[in-house]
Amino acid sequence: AKTALAKVGDVDVTEIEELWHGVEPPYDDLFAWLEGCANKPVSAAKAPFRPVMLANPIEDGDLQKLDPADYAAEWKWDGIRIQAVSEAGVRRLYTRTGDDISHTFPDVVAAMEFDGAIDGELLVRDGDGGVAPFSDLQQRLNRKTVSKKQMETYPAFIRAYDLLVDGAEDVRRKPLSERRKRLERFVAEAGERIDISELVAVTDFDQLEALRADPPHAHAEGLMLKRWDSAYTPGRPKGPWFKWKRDPFLVDAVMMYAQRGHGKRSSFYSDYTFGVWREGEAGAELVPVGKAYFGFTDAELKRLDKFVRDHTVDRFGPVRAVKAQRDFGLVLEIAFEGLQRSPRHKSGLAMRFPRVHRIRWDKPAGEADRIEALETLLAERFDARATR
């Protein structure tokens, strides 16, 4: 809706986000402004949402243009980006898109004993006081109500990245160096449900590259680089902030099920459930480990769609089961960002952000990876790192 309104008025979507919680039906002032018939309305919202600043991914050649001394580095945590606002006795917790999720995290809102607005990551603490996997946070998301047991089992907290409003002062135009100093003082008085994202000492980018590739924290996705002199600018300006995520993990899996996609892909079978081999009672069997789609070229999409239709062995409503045996099947190279244990999945494992990286038409299905490979990866790269 916000994007559609921005297109109607030919304005930046961040301007709509600024007003979103401060306008009410029938929205006469808003539409009059978008139609060019009136000035921009003033938001009457208390504890309003401020549009977030986003980072650009590091691309080839970017680092060669940067001076490490100009940038602060911090961990990129695997939670959800939030904005916590407490002003004039009103407290609100927003997602990065401005959705109010205060009702889902009343324990966090109750602990927001401050005046101002902070940008941060919503996470869950594990039993040792560290960061729990994203799957724990998922137990709290998208709920209309949350029980006392859920709050106790999955205690949420905020890891603060930035300070947007200090008391009654909007500090977004001040440089990051000053906002960070204020944030440190701010968080020191904010209570146990809010801590600060630690900075990583920057000597050179080679040192940061090693940390990015193998973060010492189990649930850090990589690094963020932010210019010390950067203002907090809504949107995704090029240059001030970069995200430098670790390289994805890769596994060869076999297509097991297919569904039609959405939008322009709605006529094609482009969403796939894939599995790896494990030893069952009757020998080797496939066990699902994830579901993903890939932005194929038109030629690839047509070829995949034909493969699914030609080798369907069963149907379950909109889902087609595809022939997948050791001597026949389609291997997909899957890229993913993380791995965690999950009792909800038959394999006992769940991937974070899986996507089809490559189609292995050349590889026999029997040579796809086994569940033991993922178990080893989990033990060595995630379980082990969590105990460092």
Where are these regions (language model features)?
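Nucleic-acid 5′ end/cap handling module spanning
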Residues: 51-97, 148, 187-188, 192-314, ...
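N-terminal nucleic-acid-engaging modules of covalent nucleotidyltransferase systems
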Residues: 1-163, 167-172, 176-177, 181-201, ...
